[in-house]
Amino acid sequence: MKEKFHFLPEFRVRFAETDMAGVVHFSQILRWAENAESDFFRCRGVDFATVAGGKLRGFPRVKLQAEFVAPARYDDRIVVKIRPLLSGRDGGEKSSAISWEFVIVAARGDNGGGCDNVEIARGRWTSVYAEADVAAGTLRRVRELPAEIVRALSEFA
């Protein structure tokens, strides 16, 4: 996995995200990565989940791979490194899928020389752009990525 990431949201681990030992549950790691995806689109003015005419268009997940390297702890300063990878027929031009790579790092301690960065997790997931019927609760069809989404992704992919 390349280490060239362009979008790096930061926050601190909240008490509610931990167990009694102060360790973050693994499901939070995936939530942090997904929140970074949402922030990525929001920062670019793209509404990546829309409802119009009773139809929802968004990105259901079709594949996920994650490696949990070290535990995250209460009050760790977390940096989520995320980047999109367009996939499809013409290098993204006619694609319906987006893959995302992520690395989550905790900055810990301050021993006078700064913080130590500890890798918490890394992984990748793939989503497809699809349309669902909200009333019926069914996936209707996979659609080509809209041009505005391809533009938002292409400068970082």
PLM regions with names:
Residues R14-D19, F26-L30, E34-E37, L64-D75, ...:
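Residue-level signal for functionally critical sites in structured catalytic/ligand-binding pockets
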Residues F5-P9, A36-E37, K55-L64, Y74-V80, ...:
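A generic structural signal for short beta-strands and their flanking turns/coil linkers
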Residues F68, A72-R77, L85-A157:
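HotDog/MaoC-like acyl-thioester-processing domains
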Residues M1, V46-G54, I104-D116:
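Intrinsically disordered, low-complexity boundary segments flanking structured domains
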Residues K2-R61, A130-A157:
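Hot-dog-fold acyl-thioester-processing enzymes
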